[in-house]
Amino acid sequence: RATICGLGMENDINNLMALYVAGLCGIGYGLRQIIDAQRECGVQTENIVISGGAGQHPFVRQLLADTCGLPVLATQCSEPVLLGSAILGAVAGNIAPSVTDAMKQFTHVDKYFYPQANFQSLHLRRYEAYKQLQQTATVIRE
């Protein structure tokens, strides 16, 4: 389910871009929420690996790094589904002993995107607002 807060009736390019960025931030905050839940269970996440789709654009990669507060590693692969199939095929064909080994052999980091310190407090405030809106939306649906 999604909640959109503050949506106006403006239809100019600036408002459309702002809505797009807000949507991407929502995806980033949702990912951050998952990472936080994993951390509470003892699973430490050091970085996010991204490839394919919208994740190919540098703006999306940087925004995810900023909203999650973790480095985003962009791979050289433009077709991650095919790469995944090749990795599994390498293991099945005994070319690699394990999926982990095949991943190390077939994947390579192309670029790194680090969280920008000057946006840290902004995204922390918005992340807290995101969680509050999420709780409010849950109450409304009950």
Where are these regions (language model features)?
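Glycine/Thr-rich phosphate-binding loops that ligate phosphate moieties of nucleotide
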Residues: 1-142
